[in-house]
Amino acid sequence: MKKITFIGAGSTIFAKNVLGDCLLTEALNGFEFALYDIDPKRLQESQLMLENLRDRYNPSVAINSYDDRKLALQNAGYVINAIQVGGYKPSTVIDFEIPKRYGLRQTIADTVGIGGIFRSLRTIPVLFDIAKDMEEMCPDAWFLNYTNPMATLTGAMLRYTNIKTIGLCHSVQVCTKDLFKALGMEHDGIEERIAGINHMAWLLEVKKDGTDLYPEIKRRAKEKQKTKHHDMVRFELMDKFGYYVTESSEHNAEYHPYFIKRNYPELISELQIPLDEYPRRCVKQIENWEKMRDDIVNNKNLTHERSKEYGSRIIEAMETNEPFTFGGNVLNTGLITNLPSKAVVEVTCVADRKKITPCFAGELPEQLAALNRTNINTQLMTIEAAVTRKKEAVYQAAMLDPHTSAELSMKDIISMCDDLFAAHGDWLPEYK
C-alpha cells in the first residue's frame, strides 16, 4: 500500500484541505494516509474528521494515526510538512513582544525580520530530525514543505540533507487573481510570468491576447491609491519599483526598510499597515476552532471540494505522469541568473513521474533582484546560524535584515537577540 505521511496533522483544517483533496483524487485510491502530531488530542480530531470524509468519498483509503514518528514515516512515498514549532504560545508571542520593548514592530513575523529569524532557528533543527528519520525509514520520499519560513527551511533541507524537497506556498497561485479582482479587471485568459523568492516573487509579465496589461494595471492602481484599501504597500512598491509582488501588503510591510518606522508613524495609517496582525489571526483562529470543532470533527455528513492547494496535484502528477505546473521553491541552480546560487528561489516547476523540474527564469530586472538580495542575505545567514549554532551568526542575520537594521542600532540588535534566546529557552538548541 502506497503511503502519504502528514507531519503536523493536528492542523485539522489544513489536513482537511490537503488530504481531503487526496481523497478526491482517483490516482491515490488505495493509499494509506499516515497522521503524526505531537498533540494527541488534535491528532485524534484530525483522524476522526478524515475518517468521516473517507467513508463518504473514498473507502479504499486507510487513515492511521501514529505516536511514533518513525513508524509514521516508514515506507512513505510522500511526506507533507505543516508543523509550527513553539506554536502561538509561547513562541509567537515572544517573537512579537520582546522586539516591541526595543521599539521594533512587526506584522506577521514568519519569513524574515527578527521573528522570522527565530522561527527558523526553532524549526530547522526539528526538520533535520525529521530528515534523519526519513533517511532511515523512507529515503526516496518527497518532502512537501508548507511550513514558514519557506526559504530558510527549504534551503536547509536541500543543502544539508539528502531528502528530495519542494517548498509550497499560496502566494503565487492567487497573485494575479487577487490583483485583478481588486482593480475590477477580468482575469480569464491572461498569461503571466512570475519569479523571485518566496513572499517576494514578482509578476514579471501579464498579458491577454498578446497585449501587455501592466499599463492598465498601473493606471488603475494609481487611482485606487487615492483611497484607503488593504493592499496599499504592494501598490506603493509597484509604483516605485515597477512590478507587483506576489505576497500580501501586510507581509511586505516588514520585508523592507520603508514602511514600519518610528520616525514616520503616519505611514501605518496612510498605508493601512496592520501591526501585530499575526497574533490577532492566531487568537481568532483559536476562537473559531472552538466554535467549529464539533461540526468538523464529528460530522458524518462533512463535505469537501478540491481546494487550491498544490499538494494533491503534485502527488497525482508523480503517480500518473500527467504533468502539473505550479510555483515552487527550489535551490537556485542557475534558474535566476542574478540571484545567489545558495538562495531558494520561487519559479515555475513541472511535476511528473516521480520528479519535479524547475524552469529557467533568467535575469530579473536589476531593482527586483536587489530587493530580493536584501532578504536572501538574512536567509542565508539564518541557515548558517542554525547549522553552526553560533550566536554571532544570529546577530549578523539580524543586523542584515532590512527592517531590523533600519530601526535599531547594532548594540540593541544584539541585546534583543540575547533576550529572545533567553525567552525561547528549550525551544532552541544551545547557541555559543
Swiss-Prot record:
Substrate binds at N148. NCBIfam families: PRK15076.1 (NF011657). Its cofactor is Mn(2+); NAD(+). Induction: Repressed by the transcriptional regulator MelR. Induced by melibiose and raffinose. GO terms for cellular component: cytosol. Catalyzes the hydrolysis of melibiose and alpha-galactosides of the raffinose family of oligosaccharides (RFOs) such as raffinose and stachyose. Cannot act on polymeric substrates such as locust bean gum. One of its GO terms (biological process) is carbohydrate metabolic process. Mn(2+) binds at C169, H199. Its EC number is 3.2.1.22. This is Alpha-galactosidase. Binds 1 Mn(2+) ion per subunit. Binds 1 NAD(+) per subunit. It holds the Pfam family Glyco_hydro_4C. The lineage of its organism: Bacteria, Bacillati, Bacillota, Bacilli, Bacillales. GO terms for molecular function: alpha-galactosidase activity; metal ion binding; oxidoreductase activity, acting on the CH-OH group of donors, NAD or NADP as acceptor. Its main location: cytoplasm. InterPro entries: GH4_Enzyme_sf (IPR053715), GlycHydrolase_4_CS (IPR019802), Glyco_hydro_4 (IPR001088), Glyco_hydro_4_C (IPR022616), Lactate_DH/Glyco_Ohase_4_C (IPR015955), NAD(P)-bd_dom_sf (IPR036291). It is found in: Cytoplasm. CDD domains: GH4_alpha_glucosidase_galactosidase (cd05297). The active site is at H170. It comes from the Bacteria. It is an enzyme of class 3 (hydrolase). It catalyses: Hydrolysis of terminal, non-reducing alpha-D-galactose residues in alpha-D-galactosides, including galactose oligosaccharides, galactomannans and galactolipids. Belongs to the glycosyl hydrolase 4 family. Homodimer. The keyword Cytoplasm applies.
